[in-house]
């Protein structure tokens, strides 16, 4: 065991990149369409077995849309038998009462459903799918019926942030226990669409104020609903402790078996191992990919001598790569970073008007076009 390396307590199983929606802020890789060789049911069983033996306690099922996998109930049952706390992150598309019942029987602990907006028309436009809002709404009712905690997630951006009060009202109508109002994090398709998604600072201040007003109102009513407001680091002056540090507690397995220290790391010019070829233990403790940004030896001067390095762990490596071209550079979010001007530029661009029509939607046709053209901007196509 490598000295000083902790346990991979949190396993994220990205079961598939397939999805019924086309959200333009999806964090999946732009070239996801070329990654089709998904792990089999038995291969996922083996991943869960190894992770549990290593000390993992929480298992998240995500995608893409994990409900596309017809073996999801089997995977949940196996994870439950191993003693994992299991969480399903879903759009609600493909969910039915029968599947909710089967997932309950399999031992699933937690379901988180995402919405795009409180307004059905805007919700479906952002999802690139007709009747998505109607399906999500009905599934929320059923999730509550089967005694799951009602956890709702809204990715907040410039096109829905001004609905923040209506979003919260919708969540209360659905008897949500927890609501995550997460300002868009700019990875994958969201980074491609950043100019059209990043809210202005004025929008952000207003949304946070309204959220705080609702918190006070709910507290006065002794209402159990918890509102979580996640500010984008693009409006911070200090970087986030991304994943609580590279290779510290978080282990992601992509649909094709690639092992990653975070779900966005696939884009980095690093050769990450595959669970089909190496054990999880070897990957976690010995692989170059997982050791690359552990500790502080990799940090540039300025970061290495910073008193905050043990709190933010140097910030986000993927963000440094996307904005500067080098994952070893100081996170541009940091006000001390020599690359902070990239963040200031993004803030300035948020003041430019942008319509939904300018967004590039996440679907196979756009992904294939991007893959062929590499870094050439793709023509926006919305699948019918």
UniProtKB/Swiss-Prot annotation:
Matches recorded under NCBIfam families: PQQ_syn_pqqE, rSAM_more_4Fe4S
PANTHER family with a match to the protein in the record: PQQA PEPTIDE CYCLASE, RADICAL SAM DOMAIN PROTEIN
Function: Catalyzes the cross-linking of a glutamate residue and a tyrosine residue in the PqqA protein as part of the biosynthesis of pyrroloquinoline quinone (PQQ).
Assembly and interaction partners: Interacts with PqqD. The interaction is necessary for activity of PqqE.
Catalytic activity: [PQQ precursor protein] + S-adenosyl-L-methionine = E-Y cross-linked-[PQQ precursor protein] + 5'-deoxyadenosine + L-methionine + H(+)
Protein name (record): PqqA peptide cyclase
Residue positions binding [4Fe-4S] cluster: 19, 23, 26
Database matches in SMART domains: Elp3
InterPro entries listed in its UniProt record: 4Fe4S-binding_SPASM_dom, Aldolase_TIM, Elp3/MiaA/NifB-like_rSAM, PQQ_synth_PqqE_bac, PqqE-like, Radical_SAM_PqqE_MftC-like, rSAM
Domain of life: Bacteria
Cofactor note: Binds 1 [4Fe-4S] cluster. The cluster is coordinated with 3 cysteines and an exchangeable S-adenosyl-L-methionine.
Pfam families to which the protein is assigned, alphabetical: Fer4_12, Radical_SAM, SPASM
UniProt keyword terms in alphabetical order: 4Fe-4S, Iron, Iron-sulfur, Metal-binding, Oxidoreductase, PQQ biosynthesis, S-adenosyl-L-methionine
Family per similarity comment: Belongs to the radical SAM superfamily. PqqE family.
CC cofactor: [4Fe-4S] cluster
């Amino acid at each position: 065991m490598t000295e000083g390396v902790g346990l991979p307590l949190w396993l994220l199983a990205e079961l598939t990149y397939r999805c019924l929606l086309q959200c333009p802020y999806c964090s999946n890789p732009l070239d996801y369409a070329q990654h089709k060789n998904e792990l089999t049911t038995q291969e996922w069983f083996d991943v869960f077995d190894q992770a549990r033996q290593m000390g993992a306690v929480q298992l998240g099922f995500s995608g893409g849309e994990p409900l596309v996998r017809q073996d999801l109930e089997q995977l949940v049952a196996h994870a439950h038998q191993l003693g994992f706390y299991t969480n399903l992150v879903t759009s609600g598309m493909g969910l039915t009462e029968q599947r909710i019942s089967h997932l309950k029987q399999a031992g699933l602990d937690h379901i988180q459903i995402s919405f795009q907006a409180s307004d059905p028309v805007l919700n479906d436009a952002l999802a690139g799918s007709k009747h998505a809002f109607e399906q999500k709404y009905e599934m929320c009712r059923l999730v509550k019926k089967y005694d799951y905690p009602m956890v709702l997630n809204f990715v907040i951006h410039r096109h829905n942030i001004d609905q923040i009060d209506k979003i919260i009202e919708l969540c209360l109508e659905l008897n949500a226990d927890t609501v995550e109002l997460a300002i868009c994090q700019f990875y994958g398709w969201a980074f491609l669409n950043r100019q059209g998604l990043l809210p202005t600072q004025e929008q952000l201040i207003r949304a946070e104020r309204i959220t705080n007003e609702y918190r006070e109102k709910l507290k006065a009513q002794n209402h159990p609903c918890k509102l979580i407001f996640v500010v984008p680091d693009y409006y911070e002056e200090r970087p986030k402790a991304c994943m609580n540090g590279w290779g510290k507690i978080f282990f992601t397995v992509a649909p094709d078996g690639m092992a990653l220290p975070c779900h966005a790391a696939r884009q980095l010019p690093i050769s990450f191992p595959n669970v089909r070829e190496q054990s999880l233990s070897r990957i976690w403790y010995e692989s170059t990919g997982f050791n690359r940004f552990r500790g502080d030896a990799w940090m540039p001067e300025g970061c290495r001598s910073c008193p905050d390095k043990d709190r933010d762990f140097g910030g986000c490596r993927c963000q440094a790569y996307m904005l500067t071209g080098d994952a070893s550079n100081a996170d541009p979010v940091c006000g001390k970073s020599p690359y902070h001007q990239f963040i200031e530029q993004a803030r300035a661009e948020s003041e430019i008007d942008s319509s939904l029509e300018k967004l590039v939607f996440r679907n196979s046709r756009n992904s294939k076009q991007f893959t062929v053209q590499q870094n050439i901007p793709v023509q926006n196509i919305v699948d019918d």
